[in-house]
C-alpha cells in the first residue's frame, strides 16, 4: 500500500475527509479506505513497509523515532488534516519525513469567530444582552452607553501568526486602530498589515478589546497576568481563543471580581473545561464556551481539502504552502 489513514479515532477521519476527498486520494495517492491505529502497526508491522504517505486528523498516534523507522521505512510525508502538530511531529521531522498540517484551514473559522466577537464587544453586546436578558432594561441601556462602538476603537491582537493575521484582515473594512504585540512581527510586515507594534503593557492599557492568539509553548505559559488584565480601560473585553495556559487564570478571575466592568470571553481554559468550583462558572462578567472557535460541522471538510491539495502539489513538484518544520515548532501553536 502506498498511502494509509492512521488515526486512533476512525470517526474523525470519516467526519473530516469528505467522500469526494477520499475518492480523489484513492485515485492520486493509492489510498486505502481502512483507518489504521497504532495497535494495527504492532500487530502487522510488515503491512506498512511500502507506505510512503500517511493521512490523518485529530487522533494521530504518537510514535517514537524507532517506531517510525521500524513500521514506515519508506515514509516520505505525513498529511495532517487538523491544526497543531506539536504532539506528534518532532520524531518524524527529525528523521527527515515531511509534515504538512491544515493549520491554515483551521485558522479560518477561528479568525471569523474572533472578528465577530470583537465587533460585538465594541458595541457592548455582551454586557447589554446579559442585563436585558435578566429583565433589567435600564441597566442594559446604561451598560450599552459605556461602549464607543467600532469607529476608531483600539483593538489589541496578541500574536500575529496565521490566526492573528487573518483576524486583522477580517477587520480591515472597519475603521479600527489595531495594536499588535508579537516579538516576531517585523516593521515591514506591521506596515503591510497597517497595524502598530507595541508591548503587552501598552496593548492592555490602551485597547478596549484584546484578543489572544499566542503560540502555545513554554515561553508563553502564564504570560497574561493580573497586572495586565487590571490595567485595561473601563469596560474592556478580553477574548481568548488561543490557549488557556497562557493566562494566569487566578489573576484573570481576580481582575474580573474587582473590575465588574470588564468582560472575559473564554473559549479555552486550562484545564479545559474549568474544574468544578472555578470562579469562571460564577462570575457574571465571564462568558465560557466549550472550545467552539475552531473547525466544526462542515467547516472540517476544509482541512481535508487543504491537505489533499497539498499532497497534489507535493506529488507534482510544486511549491507547498503548509509544510511544518522543526524551526516552526518553536513558535507554532
Over which residues does each language-model region extend?
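Rossmann-like adenosine-cofactor binding region
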Residues: 62-63, 185-279
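An N-terminal-biased, well-structured beta-alpha scaffold segment characteristic
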Residues: 1-100
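N-terminal Rossmann-fold NAD(P) dinucleotide-binding loop
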Residues: 164-165
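Phosphate-binding beta-alpha-beta segment of Rossmann-like dinucleotide-binding domains, i.e.
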Residues: 102-154, 169
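Phosphate-coordination loops involved in phosphoryl transfer and adenosine-cofactor binding
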Residues: 75, 151-154, 226, 235
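Rossmann-like dinucleotide-binding domain for NAD(H)/NADP(H)
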Residues: 99, 234-333
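Glycine-rich Rossmann-fold phosphate-binding loop(s) that bind the pyrophosphate
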Residues: 160-161
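NAD(P)-binding Rossmann-fold cofactor-contacting core
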Residues: 173-191
Amino acid at each position: 500500500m502506498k498511502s494509509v489513514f492512521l488515526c486512533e479515532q476512525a470517526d474523525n477521519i470519516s467526519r473530516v475527509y469528505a467522500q469526494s476527498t477520499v475518492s480523489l486520494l484513492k485515485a492520486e495517492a493509492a489510498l486505502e479506505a481502512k483507518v489504521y491505529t497504532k495497535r494495527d502497526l504492532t500487530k502487522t508491522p510488515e503491512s506498512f513497509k511500502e507506505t510512503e504517505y500517511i493521512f490523518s486528523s485529530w487522533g494521530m498516534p504518537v510514535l517514537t523515532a524507532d517506531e517510525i523507522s521500524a513500521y514506515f521505512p519508506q515514509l516520505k510525508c505525513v498529511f495532517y488534516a487538523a491544526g497543531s502538530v506539536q504532539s506528534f511531529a518532532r520524531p518524524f521531522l527529525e528523521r527527515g519525513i515531511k509534515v504538512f498540517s491544515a493549520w491554515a484551514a483551521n485558522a479560518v473559522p477561528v479568525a471569523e469567530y474572533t472578528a465577530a466577537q470583537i465587533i460585538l464587544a465594541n458595541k457592548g453586546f455582551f454586557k447589554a444582552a446579559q442585563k436585558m436578558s435578566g429583565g433589567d432594561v435600564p441597566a442594559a441601556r446604561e451598560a450599552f452607553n459605556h461602549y464607543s462602538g467600532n469607529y476608531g476603537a483600539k483593538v489589541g491582537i496578541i500574536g500575529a501568526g496565521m490566526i492573528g493575521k487573518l483576524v486583522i484582515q477580517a477587520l480591515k473594512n472597519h475603521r479600527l486602530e489595531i495594536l499588535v504585540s508579537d516579538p516576531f512581527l517585523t516593521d515591514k510586515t506591521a506596515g503591510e498589515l497597517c497595524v502598530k507594534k507595541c508591548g503587552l503593557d501598552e496593548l492592555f492599557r490602551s485597547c478596549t478589546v484584546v484578543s489572544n492568539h499566542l503560540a502555545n509553548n513554554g515561553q508563553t505559559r502564564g504570560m497574561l497576568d493580573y497586572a495586565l488584565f487590571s490595567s485595561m480601560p473601563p469596560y474592556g473585553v478580553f477574548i481568548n481563543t488561543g490557549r488557556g495556559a497562557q493566562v494566569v487564570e487566578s489573576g484573570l478571575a481576580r481582575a474580573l471580581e474587582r473590575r465588574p466592568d470588564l468582560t472575559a470571553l473564554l473559549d479555552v481554559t486550562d484545564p479545559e473545561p474549568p474544574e468544578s468550583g472555578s470562579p469562571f462558572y460564577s462570575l457574571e462578567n465571564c462568558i465560557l464556551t466549550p472550545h467552539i472557535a475552531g473547525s466544526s460541522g462542515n467547516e472540517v471538510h476544509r482541512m481535508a481539502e487543504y491537505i489533499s491539495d497539498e499532497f497534489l502539489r507535493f506529488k507534482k513538484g510544486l511549491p507547498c504552502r503548509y509544510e511544518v518544520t522543526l524551526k516552526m515548532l518553536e513558535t507554532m501553536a
